[in-house]
UniProtKB/Swiss-Prot annotation:
PROSITE patterns: ZF_RING_1, ZF_RING_2. One of its GO terms (biological process) is protein ubiquitination. This is E3 ubiquitin-protein ligase RNF182. It is a multi-pass membrane protein. The keyword Methyltransferase does not apply. A zinc finger (RING-type) spans 20-68. Its main location: membrane. SMART domains: RING. It comes from Ailuropoda melanoleuca. SUPFAM superfamilies: RING/U-box.
Amino acid sequence: MASQSPDEAAEAQVSDELECKICYNRYNLKQRKPKVLECCHRVCAKCLYKIIDFGDSPQGVIVCPFCRFETCLPDEEVSSLPDDSNILVNLTCGGKGKKGLPENPTELLLTPKRLASLVSPSHTSSNCLVITIMEVQRESSPSLSSTPVVEFYRPASFDSVTTVSHNWTVWKCTSLLFQTSIRVLVWLLGLLYFSSLPLGIYLLVSKKVTLGVVFVSLVPSSLVILMVYGFCQCVCHEFLDCVAPSS
């Protein structure tokens, strides 16, 4: 006895799956649609109608003829039961549709001509067509580099903020240097004020009249300089407050 080839065995298995196990008629897209019960057994719609007509099942329930599992009937209509989508795909893609399919049945190239060949004009009922969409990989353009290009956006406001910050730092350093020099000058004037009078008297007693007069005259001069310094300091503070940029 000659053994079947793998292709013939697969064909026989597919053909067996397309038959109802009660009436052994082939499923179709009209009266013998493959209906799936809750127990996952498949029965054609015509056989289910006969089971209901025989009255073997309670109202609103269908008893599976294979395992006696009860399946609730939504709206008490057989048509409300779910169809077996895999068998519907095989039925829909049968005949001339098979010629247009690729070798791998899970891959289908979507073109208008291919879709038109899969749908028969005579099938006016609602059919289910399951399609696996594949991504077609195209060769990348040779002009594009494989290294990703990242462009950093630097708003113009950042430059203005940086400039203002730099100017403020320079202005702050200048102001600090000016205040330090003024403080040193005040200390020198204070030292000169408190030491010039006794030093001048000592020089006058020592008969060094010229130097003594000079040192004694430094007392009112230092007072005048201190007054001028106080006035200049007030003016400078007002000027700095007006010119310094707001933070």
